[in-house]
């Protein structure tokens, strides 16, 4: 059946998870601190910025990076994510073709730190490795990164889906941004619905 967000939260998330764990689950940097030591593969964090004064180093930090992703640590629904796929004439190029100078990136990261895209009043901006999807998935969409979400309940997988980016989602695999969700059969891994 379709597990809506409200049904998921009210029927599974809130009754079966300790409230004290929510801040960790909602913070990408804290999750990385927990998952990395136990060997979970993660995109490399190049830099993180929690305070505005740290942005004075941004141009130096980005000097050697041509591809990266900027995201809010506590963001949701894909908001605030900028995917950079290259650099030309002193500007970075987004996956959607938009060009970003250093001042535009500073403004965007300042918005993230200010909390524009987060659950809280203040946030941290993450600059991390851009992960490239396997070429076999390029037939679905070749300008983004499809992912797989597995819903666990009491340590057992109960549902799975692949989130596939679209032109409407600007290459992001986020349903709120216009990506497509494909239901996956847990036994075969084949798509069972969309």
Where are these regions (language model features)?
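Phosphate-binding site of ATP-dependent enzymes
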Residues: 95-194
